[in-house]
Amino acid sequence: MSMAQSETVAFYFDPICPWAWRAADWIREVRQVRPVEVEWRFFSLEEVNKGDKTVDWEGGRSAPALRVLALVRRQHGNDAVDRLYAALGQARFVRNEELSNPAVIEQALASAGLDPGLRAAALADASTRDEVLREHYAVVEHMEAFGVPTLVLDGGRGPGIFGPVINPVPRGEEAGQLWDRLVWLMRQPGFYEIKRTRPQPRH
């Protein structure tokens, strides 16, 4: 294992986003090879796109799932959010189920070892919506976040980036090496942006 400095990273996600799902898979891998703690934070792509009439959210709304995640964190903590997010991702991206379906959320809760009744409780509690939006707009204000995955170092108080956008997900030491390089880059005061035009160069 690398002797890298311990880090706490705030990982902002929307459970409807496949890129955030892959990055979450990666950051879980990083935890196995680097001294990293992950704080799971909420970001609403629906809120970002609410004025865009070209976006059809009917089959892919994530607001109910985010509200359930907020109540789960309040009652059971960060580790339970991790488990539920993983279960929701399995439903959405492995089994191609819609997170707007109440039964899908309840099954994910059960798979995460949580009470399926938390879905109805979260949607009956208006403060869960407030909590999601408060967290969403806090990172928008802090670093002008616009999408997910968004990573912010120092438990959400330090420098941040949009990304990484990765496919396939690196494993083992390769995951750790990507983390090392990203953290180094994020902590460079002059760094602003980097973007790859395509996965592989044309020959």
What is each stretch, according to the model?
Residues 4-10:
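Extreme N-terminal starter segment of soluble prokaryotic enzymes
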Residues 13, 54-55, 91, 118, ...:
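Residues at structural and domain junctions
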Residues 26-30, 102-203:
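C-terminal cap of thioredoxin/glutaredoxin-like
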